[in-house]
UniProtKB/Swiss-Prot annotation:
Upper taxonomic lineage: Bacteria, Bacillati, Bacillota, Bacilli, Bacillales
Keywords, in A-Z order: Amino-acid biosynthesis, Aromatic amino acid biosynthesis, Cytoplasm, Transferase
Encoding gene, per UniProt annotation: aroA1
Gene Ontology biological process terms, A to Z: amino acid biosynthetic process; aromatic amino acid family biosynthetic process; chorismate biosynthetic process
PANTHER family assigned to the protein according to its UniProt record, in alphabetical order: AROM/DEHYDROQUINATE SYNTHASE, PENTAFUNCTIONAL AROM POLYPEPTIDE
Pathway: Metabolic intermediate biosynthesis; chorismate biosynthesis; chorismate from D-erythrose 4-phosphate and phosphoenolpyruvate: step 6/7
Protein name: 3-phosphoshikimate 1-carboxyvinyltransferase 1
Keyword match Cytoplasm: yes
NCBIfam families: aroA (TIGR01356)
Binding site for 3-phosphoshikimate: K23, S24, R28, S168, Q170, D316, K343
Amino acid sequence: MENKTVIPHAKGLKGTIKVPGDKSISHRAVMFGALAKGTTTVEGFLPGADCLSTISCFQKLGVSIEQAEERVTVKGKGWDGLREPSDILDVGNSGTTTRLILGILSTLPFHSVIIGDESIGKRPMKRVTEPLKSMGAQIDGRDHGNLTPLSIRGGQLKGIDFHSPVASAQMKSAILLAGLRAEGKTSVTEPAKTRDHTERMLEAFGVNIEKDGLTVSIEGGQMLTGQHVVVPGDISSAAFFLVAGAMVPHSRITLTNVGINPTRAGILEVLKQMGATLAMENERVQGGEPVADLTIETSVLQGVEIGGDIIPRLIDEIPIIAVLATQASGRTVIKDAEELKVKETNRIDTVVSELTKLGASIHATDDGMIIEGPTPLKGGVTVSSHGDHRIGMAMAIAALLAEKPVTVEGTEAIAVSYPSFFDHLDRLKSE
């Protein structure tokens, strides 16, 4: 286990950072390139552990993929070019890889087995495996196909009209990918809008998709064609430095080339509601995704209530929003966020336990948390990432305002999504 001691830094963070490529888009660029006919090139790929797991799985399925840091070349031969793997497909810590590849494997006329790390082994897969089974796939595993390892025997599927009980982009994506090879039409209706990278990118790869409110539909039998994909910066990674810039005194941080897809940009709305001085410049569309440069300055912050339809648009940012709330005046209530319980950790419990160690006034609720602020954060303690990249980074940012140094345990988890996180933090401290 790697540990990192973070020295408080209330003198201000200054500088310009280019955050790593978007994790969601990096996964999909490799997957869709593997399903397409022709060559797909990817620029700005995130070479984090999760996305490397996706590359490894598709290489085992017989796809030629070359990766050199942020550039990837996928030589796709279409769906029929995928081959039965001679080895188990190891998804590592990646929930995205697991759920999306389930949709793909369900259509293929061979047997495959998925395993992952200890965290993946606790994450519920029935939300994906049940609709795929109803389409005709054979999937088995622990807890009646709810937990990895999972065994999949795919084949000819039938389209489905699925009403999702939870707002999950991974579930929606898995069913749509299965629908691409199913007989007839497949539709997914969500309870709330979730990230739409799958729909945007499938269209860029030549697939026709129908959208009607909260329903997305796809006709079976469509082919993908190789593309050139430029991956924008990940707003979920940018969120850590947006929060640091807003709450560390005397700070001004610019983050360039950040994806601001409205289905992901809830963090920007919350920052503005809390009173952050946030500027968005050089707005443009890049590969079908809206992108901008974001500049944040130290701000006087107010507590807010966060819940309802915005939650799927900032679910991954809640750990760092909780850190921000400790420095805002008044009460911040985060609700309707039960989905936090089935992330890499139960993020309601891990956020509350670790921020409590730092002296924050925070307590858990059934569907979120309540934070009172502003509170000085004490140091001289050890906090844990619990093996969760977003908890590790959130604690490192909180430590910047602590009264004494803070040791963060398990910082190797951060490499899942932001391998250069501490390098970027050191650069902002030194400028």
